A protein has these predicted regions:
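N-terminal anchoring/stem segment of glycosyltransferases
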Residues: 1-68, 76-82, 151, 217-224
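Short, polar loop motifs at secondary-structure junctions
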Residues: 36-45, 91-99, 198-200
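A structural signal for short, well-ordered beta-strand segments and their strand-loop junctions
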Residues: 37-38, 86-90, 110, 147, ...
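Short loop/helix-cap segments at secondary-structure boundaries that form the rim of catalytic
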Residues: 42-51, 98-105, 206
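A conserved donor-nucleotide-binding helix/loop in the catalytic core
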Residues: 57-89, 141, 175-187
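GT-A fold catalytic core of metal-dependent nucleotide-sugar glycosyltransferases
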Residues: 70-117
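Short beta-strand-to-loop element that shapes/binds the nucleotide-sugar donor at the catalytic cleft/hinge
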Residues: 106-134
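Catalytic core and acceptor-binding pocket of nucleotide-sugar-dependent glycosyltransferases
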Residues: 137-221
């Protein structure tokens, strides 16, 4: 199968790119045909044994870069639709154990490590397209690692890009940006595969969970 791993690495976040790629070379779907799609504003040289597709992407200050991720993916619909499955991974993460075919499914999400299956902090303003009512059943998912079939992922990306743009036109930014919109979408379109927090584990926490993908600790003011 053709697998695309989407990574946004602009401005100071470029420092995390090579370590992530090297870790993915070792641990991410080693039995599949993987292409790394790198969205960046830099001229880069990456060491990898896998295929690379570098897509020039303008950097925007936080939170506009994360809010715009689904728009970026939608703008590259034709290229990304060549893949059978697509996964997005935050660049400031690192694979530390095998991630295999268990993640292959139509709509794949990861339980947020800060909430471990709870409701988390969904968007509470009814004016936002990301709004989740208190009586709606939900589990809170992380925005840092998710994916699915190219058809389902790009369908989601198109819808979320439109919703985020609709919010912005009314001067609304959801509480956790794109992650809030992801969680709203999954209430309406339940995931077909839910990964536990070992697939998005905060660095130096939960060593007992058999960690597979770490969210690296960083000083936000030094990279945003």
């Amino acid at each position: 199968m053709k697998i695309g791993l989407l990574i946004i690495a602009t401005n100071k976040y470029i420092q995390f790119l090579q370590p992530l790629i090297s870790s993915a070379d070792n641990f991410f779907l080693n039995n599949q045909d993987v292409t790394y799609y790198i969205f960046t504003d830099r001229d880069i040289q990456i060491e990898t044994s896998r295929k690379l597709c570098i897509i020039n992407t303008e950097h925007k200050d936080w939170p506009w870069m994360t809010l715009g991720r689904y728009k970026i993916f939608t703008e590259n619909y034709k290229e990304l639709s060549k893949m059978d499955y697509i996964y997005y991974c935050d660049v400031d993460m690192k694979f530390v154990s095998d991630v295999g075919n268990e993640i292959i499914s139509d709509r794949v999400v990861t339980i947020h490590p800060g909430f471990l299956g709870g409701r988390g902090t969904p968007e509470h303003r009814i004016e936002s397209t990301a709004y989740i009512a208190p009586d709606e059943n939900m589990t809170y998912y992380a925005g840092g690692f998710n994916g699915g079939s190219s058809e389902k992922f790009l369908e989601m990306s198109t819808i979320l890009a439109e919703r985020i743009n609709q919010d912005l036109s009314r001067n609304i930014i959801a509480i956790w940006h794109d992650e809030s919109h992801l969680n709203r979408y999954m209430v309406d379109n339940p995931p077909t595969k839910i990964l536990d927090n070992s697939y998005c584990c905060i660095e130096n926490e939960y060593p007992e969970c058999g960690r597979k993908l770490l969210a690296l600790i960083k000083k936000h003011n030094e990279v945003r």
